[in-house]
Swiss-Prot record:
GO terms for molecular function: endopeptidase inhibitor activity; proteasome binding. This is Silencing boundary-establishment protein FUB1-like protein. Interacts with the 20S proteasome. Belongs to the proteasome inhibitor PI31 family. The lineage of its organism: Eukaryota, Fungi, Dikarya, Ascomycota, Taphrinomycotina. GO terms for biological process: chromatin organization; proteasome-mediated ubiquitin-dependent protein catabolic process; ubiquitin-dependent protein catabolic process. It is found in: Cytoplasm; Nucleus. GO terms for cellular component: cytosol; nucleus. InterPro entries: PI31-like (IPR045128), PI31_Prot_C (IPR013886). May play a role in the establishment of transcriptional silencing boundaries, preventing the propagation of heterochromatic silencing. Keywords: Chromatin regulator, Cytoplasm, Nucleus. Residues 194-265 are annotated as: Disordered. It comes from the Eukaryota.
Amino acid sequence: MNNPTSDDRLRFQQKCHKSMLNTGAIFKNCKLRNGDVLQEVTESLTEDSEFNYIVNESQNVSTRLIFWNKWIYILCANTSSNITATRIFRLDDDQPWNLESLVAEVCPVDTDNRLAEHAARTAKDTSANELNYESYQEKSRAPFGFAGPFGAMPGSQPMFPSIGASDLYPAGIGGSDMGNDGGMIPTFNHPIFHPENRSRNEQASANRTNIPPGARYDPTGPGDFRGFGRDERKPQFPFKGPRSQFPGEPDNDDFMPPGSSDMFM
């Protein structure tokens, strides 16, 4: 039998259908080539019909026959787990088809167990993620275990210098206990509003022509004394006076970055 007729093709389809039922598969429906769906096998079957079954009460399995030369290919697919397999029979083989191995290949015994374990594992992970989130919240703490912001504690001397704390507040408002003579909102007590109190070097120094009064200045290299408020022509000891500053030391008007009082922000 090299070229099966239409009747032969329908006969082989019915043979395949009976073989599937012998494996314990439950017939679900049959889809014809034109898209019609049959709830039972009748004589109106056409070539290339797709038979759908239920295996192990939960797995959806589809079969389809392909005829080529002297062979019949049975294509089987588990649409629930995307497992496929194929069996080949000769057209002149009149023996019954045993498709138990085919069904077992596309529907392994542990398929349901794997699906159940996956569902249980997913549910477990979901429940673990839904635990009280607040129980895992770690309260924000200041550095080194201090309850207050980094710097001076109220009523005590700071263990670490509160660098830039005075820049966060206007003069006389807030700040540390060490005093506050400046801030990001200068008042009329700020030196920029009292040029008469500036030093002679600050007013006349040729090296400060491009530096506005009260601005921060970082030295550009050796011999640059503008950060000390003096120039090379009038050397003086840089640490003279209580308000002497190192080169590059932040001025009272320098802004502190947001969240500077809490390193965890």
